[in-house]
């Protein structure tokens, strides 16, 4: 049974004056690809990341350090407004570092920031379509008949009406929380499988893609916590004739976005084809369960591309092909990706010629 979240009891306390002090909630990626956070009090309004201290936590409790040498450090990397506390309170996305100053093994932002710096003159933009699935606290798909199944896929994608969509109130709350926080969320929609949803983040330039997607995920699981709902980013949470969950990654450089850019898009696709296996290796765990060649996916063992082809590894949208410039969509990434790793390897392959 889920713990009840007492918003009505909490509300009067959130309305109290904070005495000139503010909350800073440090958020980080743990050793298993999940998210953790803890709060510190700051004595002044934070307007720049340099005002925030380097903090630490017990890495032995997050699978990031041994118990005998457990301190892991949090270095602030991006600031967002806090939609849960409001006011001038903030969320602080942080990188993790070992006590010898080296990045923790789960800190993929450190490397990708260097990659993005090398490619900054190309002005790379990304947009990620984050799919996810909602479950009751007992592990049942949210809104599904207990011990049974809803009707087959068909009416749920972008659906409207009772029995076709589930948890729209939660999804709307998350959308508004992202907008308030400053996350560059660009849309939402119900997905093909019932209780599966998608939100889109972007376009974001360079390293900010990973920052904004991770914070959007954090906001989602925090909002879902208030509803007593679990969020799954597993790429194939349910076996059977149900769609998996991906994180389709849209990508372009300035040259691709300008008239005549199709030749640069095609050149990028050729480079991506040559490193298919290297990309698959960082495109999410259990992705072989999703990339089967069915349910709008290409097969994990084969690279393919095409215009408006949702069964391909790389899709070029029809409107992009018609105009002759724009972007490409990499449909291989799973819903549980680390976006820093995905955006980083795309840059390495298409710009840095790794």
Swiss-Prot record:
Known EC number: 6.3.1.2
Gene Ontology process terms (BP): glutamine biosynthetic process
GO MF terms, alphabetically ordered: ATP binding; glutamine synthetase activity
Pfam family, one: Gln-synt_N
Gene3D superfamilies: Glutamine synthetase, N-terminal domain (3.10.20.70), Glutamine synthetase/guanido kinase, catalytic domain (3.30.590.10)
UniProt entry keywords in alphabetical sequence: ATP-binding, Cytoplasm, Ligase, Nucleotide-binding
Domain GS catalytic: 108-354
The organism's place on the tree of life at top rank: Eukaryota
Matches recorded under PROSITE patterns: GLNA_1, GLNA_ATP, GS_BETA_GRASP, GS_CATALYTIC
Catalytic activity: L-glutamate + NH4(+) + ATP = L-glutamine + ADP + phosphate + H(+)
GO cellular component: cytoplasm
Protein localization: Cytoplasm
Residue ranges constituting the GS beta-grasp domain according to the UniProt record: 22-101
Self-association state and partner proteins as the record states: Homooctamer.
Family: Belongs to the glutamine synthetase family.
Protein name: Glutamine synthetase
Taxonomic lineage: Eukaryota, Fungi, Dikarya, Basidiomycota, Agaricomycotina
Gene (name only): GLN1
